[in-house]
């Protein structure tokens, strides 16, 4: 059997790929692997607003109860709430049922350990091994030893209180627009900003089970960009379906992506002496403009592979406090163990409030360099040709010399398709367009 777990848990089309049977098996195996067995284990379970969440929750909970563990159901809350509450409630593990920014027909199951971190590959593989073994040696308790389902009504309240406490300042006087993606932030974000005194204007906060992420939220911020200007707001925030990521919009309707948010927050935290080792953790896909801005502000950058799990690994290994991705996955490790959209939005709003500067002014710390991405079709067995072919290597060096430190060439093989992605950044859009297309053609020609 191929690997069940992807980069962010188990994901697939609900009821055909991610079936109730698979959810039951994951609940049963996960509860067995993630608990010590010396006490009655407690596992938190939450979901986003997808229609398939109820079906998968029922099956997952049944699996958890079948090995004698307690399932504590939190209802609809953001993914980062599960990470936070797993620690606060002293649970053995947490599970989120969500497919994040994906369309409604998809769903996913993601586990957190007792410290609120996503599982290691080894633990995920062990869960899969237990399922594939037919649950060999996994107990099937009876009578009083079966597990119980507990409904935790205070979960949302507890998470909102935590998020508000991360800024310690009133947001009175700020006009803030929120796009909740008809997802898990539709109560948490609205209540947090309102309770902190902001005047809020909300769109896409009416989930019906089928409209999550539908032309809204962080993957479609266009409506919010217009709405912020129309309502004369100081800023806006767009969340994805499970609210582990967030993008911002300034008062002029410009998108403020994860690179801008990271740079703004890093600069502010450094000034307060709260940016560990004056270092920001980013991925190779962050715009070169971020690197230049950080250099100007005397902020070090640690660069990882693409994926928030690699950002987190680097942060934990070195003790860094801030990291994230252009997509809006921002990790404030002093506050939470995973990307947290609401915490991110509140940090940005509090910086605007404390500095007295507009978001447009704050984002001027960084200038985005033009970026172009071209796909080159290559056979799966030739995805490293750019590292092996002498002519291609020479051409890349020539391009980098022409960009003269004000641009870069990055080639990334796709993990799922027979292609490599040729990315160039530089000051001249027309120049890098031509370079990228020429390099992609050269790579394709060498493969044929």
Swiss-Prot record:
Record-annotated active site: 100
Alphabetized GO MF terms: magnesium ion binding; phosphoglucosamine mutase activity; phosphomannomutase activity
Sites where the protein binds Mg(2+): 100, 240, 242, 244
EC number: 5.4.2.10
Domain of life: Bacteria
PROSITE patterns with a match to the protein in the record: PGM_PMM (PS00710)
GO biological process: carbohydrate metabolic process; peptidoglycan biosynthetic process; UDP-N-acetylglucosamine biosynthetic process
A Gene Ontology cellular-component term: cytosol
Keyword annotations from UniProtKB, A to Z: Isomerase, Magnesium, Metal-binding, Phosphoprotein
PTM description: Activated by phosphorylation.
InterPro entries: A-D-PHexomutase_a/b/a-I, A-D-PHexomutase_a/b/a-I/II/III, A-D-PHexomutase_a/b/a-II, A-D-PHexomutase_a/b/a-III, A-D-PHexomutase_C, A-D-PHexomutase_C_sf, A-D-PHexomutase_CS, Alpha-D-phosphohexomutase_SF
Cofactor binding note of this UniProt entry: Binds 1 Mg(2+) ion per subunit.
Pfam family, one: PGM_PMM_II
Cofactor: Mg(2+)
Positions bearing Phosphoserine: 100
Catalytic activities: alpha-D-glucosamine 1-phosphate = D-glucosamine 6-phosphate
Cited function: Catalyzes the conversion of glucosamine-6-phosphate to glucosamine-1-phosphate.
NCBIfam families cross-referenced by the UniProt entry: glmM, PRK10887.1
HAMAP family named among the record's database cross-references: GlmM_B
Family: Belongs to the phosphohexose mutase family.
Protein name: Phosphoglucosamine mutase
Organism name: Clostridium perfringens (strain 13 / Type A)
């Amino acid at each position: 059997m191929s690997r069940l777990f992807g980069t962010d848990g188990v994901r697939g089309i609900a009821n055909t790929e991610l079936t109730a049977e698979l959810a039951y098996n994951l609940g049963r195996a996960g509860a067995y692997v993630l608990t010590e067995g010396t006490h009655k284990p407690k596992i938190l379970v939450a979901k986003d607003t997808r229609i398939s969440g109820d079906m998968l929750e029922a099956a997952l909970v049944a699996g958890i109860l079948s090995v004698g563990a307690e399932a504590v159901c939190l209802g609809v809350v953001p993914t980062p709430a599960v990470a936070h509450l797993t620690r606060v409630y002293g649970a053995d593990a947490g599970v989120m049922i969500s497919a994040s920014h994906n369309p409604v027909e998809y769903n996913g199951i993601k586990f957190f350990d007792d410290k609120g971190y996503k599982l290691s590959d080894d633990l995920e593989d062990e869960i899969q091994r237990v399922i594939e073994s037919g649950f060999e040696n996994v107990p099937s308790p009876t009578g009083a030893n079966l597990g119980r389902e507990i409904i935790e009504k205070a979960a949302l309240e507890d998470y909102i209180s935590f998020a508000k406490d991360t800024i310690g300042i009133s947001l009175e006087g700020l006009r803030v627009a929120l796009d909740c993606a008809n997802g898990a932030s539709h109560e948490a974000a609205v209540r947090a900003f309102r309770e902190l005194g902001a005047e809020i204007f909300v769109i896409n906060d009416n989930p019906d089970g089928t409209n999550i992420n539908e032309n809204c939220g962080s993957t479609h911020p266009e409506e919010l960009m217009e709405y912020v200007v129309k309502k004369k707001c100081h800023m806006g925030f767009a969340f994805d379906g499970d609210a582990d990521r967030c993008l911002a919009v300034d008062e002029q309707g410009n998108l403020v992506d994860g690179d801008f948010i990271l740079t703004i927050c890093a600069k502010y935290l450094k000034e307060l002496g709260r940016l560990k080792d004056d270092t920001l953790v980013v991925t190779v896909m962050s715009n070169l403009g971020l690197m230049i801005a950080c250099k100007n502000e005397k902020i070090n950058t640690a660069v990882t592979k693409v994926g928030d799990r690699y950002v987190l690994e680097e942060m934990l290994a070195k003790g860094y406090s801030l990291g994230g991705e252009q997509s809006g996955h921002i990790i404030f490790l002093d506050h939470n163990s995973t990307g947290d959209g609401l915490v991110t939005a509140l940090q940005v709003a509090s910086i605007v409030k404390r500095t007295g500067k507009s978001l447009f002014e704050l984002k001027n710390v960084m200038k985005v360099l033009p970026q172009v991405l071209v796909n080159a079709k290559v056979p799966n067995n030739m995805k490293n040709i750019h590292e092996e072919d002498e002519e291609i290597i020479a051409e890349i060096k020539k391009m980098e010399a022409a960009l003269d430190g004000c641009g870069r060439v990055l080639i990334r093989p796709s993990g799922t398709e027979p292609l490599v992605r040729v990315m160039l950044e530089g000051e001249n859009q027309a120049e890098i367009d031509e370079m990228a297309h020429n390099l992609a053609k050269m790579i394709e020609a060498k493969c044929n």
